[in-house]
Every structure is written in C-alpha cells, then in structure tokens.
C-alpha cells in the first residue's frame, strides 16, 4: 500500500479522491446546461420550451408559440388533460416529469426553457428546482405565488423565475382564458417599435416573451432582458 511505501498522508487520499469526484459531479450538474448554451453546444434545433402541466393556459400559449415555429412540448401525468393538448395537435409527454423515466426518455437538449404551470404552486417550485441545474436556473419559470418568501433571493436555490410580474396564480390565468384572453404574436419593425406597440395595446396586455430573429427567446420577467427591438416578435 501507499502507507507501507511511506507516502505521506496516504490514508487521506481516499477521502481526497471521493471529494474530488463529488465536486466534479456537482459542478457538472449545475453548469452543463448553461455552459453548453454559452458555447453553443446544444442541439442545432431552435430553442424550445418544455411546459409542465396541461391546461387551457398552457395549451393556448404553446399553440401560439408553435405557430411561430418554436418547438414546444407539454408534459402531464393526467390522461384527460394531456388528451386535450394532443387534440390541439401539440407534442405531449404522458407521465410524471420528475420520474426517472422522464429524465431518461425526454431529450432535454431540445429545450432551453421550461414553464411549470400546474395548479400546485409547491409542485411547480419542485419541478423548477429539479430541472434548474440542467436547463439553467434563469431559464426555468413558474406560475403561482409563494407566500411569505423573498422571491428574488430564492431564484437560484428554490423554485423558478416568476413567469409574470407580479406573479399570477393558476386560477387567475384560467379565468383570463375563459373570459376570452388570448395570445398574440406581434413583429416589431422600424416604423412599429416597442413604444408604439405599448401605446396601442389594450389594458391588461402582458408581454411574456419575445422571439429574436435568431430564434432565441427572451422572457420579459427575466432581469437583464431589456426591451424587444426591431425584428423581434412579441408574444403577449
């Protein structure tokens, strides 16, 4: 053994080796998605969105994005809800998104963003926490509210970014869709810039994200996104 050969601290090498492996795995898990995105090593397809939770809101949202050639997939463990998404001709995954089967069978490299939008706020936060390291902490979003919490301080530890500012609950979004709220895609031009867009929108319009000419998606609630510009397509 190394100890028998007189190597100093030989007994500690096993512990050092274990610690090195553990740190390597941890860093790999938390940086793989963001690093691949930064180095442009992800799938050559356009950036897509993984929705967790099939509902009138997510189905309408996904249909509008699909019309803009944004890859979308809705995952849900409820057959009745997922069937509605299938009838809307959307790609679906039937099963528990937090299961081992989902991690093995879903090609997550297709998705640069995720929206957790079930009727369970705690579950939405759990999903975002689980997928954050792989997709990117700043690119996992959720609906709902977490009472008694400083949301900003929790963004990079528990849960996801709020999809809306201020946050909206599942019930609020469902009622909006039932009342006729729908998604629109508006392309900005030199003549019709963001200022004119904002001035002509009806009260209650929410800008959720915009699609860059490159296909990249920027979410309005993300700090540092700025404002959409010429050539961008706003989803509101």
Task: Indicate where each model-derived feature is located.
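Cytosolic regulatory regions of ion transport systems
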Residues: 1-236
